[in-house]
Amino acid sequence: MAKPYLYLNFIMLVPLHPAIVHFPIALVTAALILHGIQLWKPNWLSRVGGLWLMGWATISAIAAVLTGQKEAAKAGKIGYPTETLILIERHETFGNIVVWGSIVFLIGWVYLFFKYKNDIRLDRLALAFLLLLFIIVTVSAYTGGQLVYIHGVGTP
């Protein structure tokens, strides 16, 4: 019979952050593109496509930050140079901004969507916030890429 604690031990050792982190990047980008198309050609797409994608992006961003915190704790034990630790801290800060920004934006968007169902101004405002969130996600992804490809964080 399999021992459940061995399975949980294996899950804790597997680096999940690299696998999960790409979902919020892709979903925020897709939400921005689809919402922009919906504003440009309203009859082509449903108004809720970007909203649904933003919901999934928020969930995946929460998972990415939680797994990233686990990976940062592992990186702290390795003893990287100060420059690398500063970049890790900056990456964590941008990740937290993405998560909390996504949560607040999603709750606000859902509330205003149901309050003002057919207001084009809400859609334009949502597009502006999606663009801002996309920029922050891009900066966070860039710092994460620097950590991996330049500083070797998370590589064997």
Residue ranges and their predicted role:
Residues P4-P156:
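Polytopic transmembrane helical bundles with strong interfacial aromatic enrichment
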